[in-house]
Amino acid sequence: MTVVYGARMPGLLLYKEELAACELRDDIDLNITVDRGDESWKGKVGFVPNICRDISPSVENTVALICGPPIMVRLTLPLFFELGFSRENIYTSLEMRMKCGIGKCGRCNVGSKYICKDGPVFSLAELDQLTGEY
């Protein structure tokens, strides 16, 4: 499994203990990056889409899971299309659409789905079937 995890700066990285444990595993290729490093940062510096481009994962037996700020998702999606990923094998999370989180307010309704109850993770193929803005 290959993981690309990014943050704006080192101090904003979450799950540091869990990431340290993942770095010890042979079955996880962990790529941690920050947009802006500081003098203490020894890791990669760069945007998630650029790190993904450098890795260039094979589409064979692979799915892409993209989670993050909308701008990062928008910049990363075209890369996976360029690499040949199908819309069925690209997943993203729409939790930013949720308000109440229990399906009562209707604010996260997109087509026939409630993001809070039916998601928040959907493939792009699933999202294509929904009407409305996502």
Model-derived features with residue positions:
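FNR/FR-type flavoprotein reductase catalytic core
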Residues: M1-K99
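Alpha-helix termini
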Residues: L19, F81, Y114-C116, G132
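Short Fe-S-cluster ligation motifs
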Residues: G106, K117, F122, E126-Y134
